[in-house]
């Protein structure tokens, strides 16, 4: 199914994993079709928004029938590159880094953190959650050898930009940034910022102003 992702709103693209997870859940329950109303009620997203999101990708469903679960799953796997095993590296094995290594996408069979990096000599050479921890000096060599192009960044804030520069030199294409720093990278590298403090403040704001 041909579509130009450059013309699709970022908000739509960010909702695709939510749809995928929900449809996967329906599949595991033996459900073979779903309509936008059911998706709306489960994910708290307006039906009109769901239909508009899906319309960017062509005819995913039929009026009066809804969406076939198997067809949706096949589409989402292709759109999200989830039909392939994706190897990910993590840089910064502090408390958050250790937690992510232990979790290691346990509900996503296709995504796995396979390599970790740090500068602490007491950590380097050990394994955490079955993931080997390498020294930062070996970053580019290991990433290139393992053909890894996605990295989770959990370093201290002051080290984030320096490490980001190293990741760019290693031809990384995507960075999930858990540090408070707003790192600068070329347009060829996608960065998603996850600031837990901001997310919590946002939650508290909505609780205060929008709760019944």
Swiss-Prot record:
Main location: cytoplasm
Lineage: superkingdom: Bacteria
DNA-binding segment(s): 18-57
MF-aspect GO terms: DNA binding; DNA-binding transcription factor activity
Binding-site residues for NAD(+), renumbered to this chain: 92-97
Function text: Modulates transcription in response to changes in cellular NADH/NAD(+) redox state.
Family listed: Belongs to the transcriptional regulatory Rex family.
Protein name: Redox-sensing transcriptional repressor Rex
Gene name for this UniProt entry: rex
């Amino acid at each position: 199914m041909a579509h130009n992702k450059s013309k699709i709103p970022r908000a739509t693209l960010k909702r695709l994993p939510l749809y995928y997870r929900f449809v996967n859940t329906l599949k595991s329950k033996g459900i073979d079709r779903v309509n936008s109303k059911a998706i709306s009620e489960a994910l708290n997203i307006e039906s009109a928004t769901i239909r508009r999101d899906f319309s960017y990708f062509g005819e995913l469903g039929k009026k009066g029938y809804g969406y076939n679960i198997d067809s949706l799953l096949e589409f989402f796997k292709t759109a999200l590159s989830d039909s392939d095993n994706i190897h990910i590296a993590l840089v910064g094995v502090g408390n958050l880094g250790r937690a992510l290594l232990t979790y290691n996408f346990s509900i996503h069979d296709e995504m796995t953190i396979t390599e970790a990096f740090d500068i602490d000599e007491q950590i380097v050479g050990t394994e955490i959650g079955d993931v080997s921890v390498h020294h930062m000096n070996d970053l580019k060599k290991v990433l290139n050898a393992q053909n890894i192009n996605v990295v989770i960044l959990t370093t201290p804030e002051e080290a984030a930009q320096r490490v980001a520069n190293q990741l760019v030199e290693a031809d990384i294409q995507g960075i999930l940034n858990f540090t408070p720093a707003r790192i600068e990278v070329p347009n060829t590298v996608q960065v998603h910022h996850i600031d837990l403090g901001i997310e919590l403040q946002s939650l508290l704001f909505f609780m205060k102003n929008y709760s019944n």
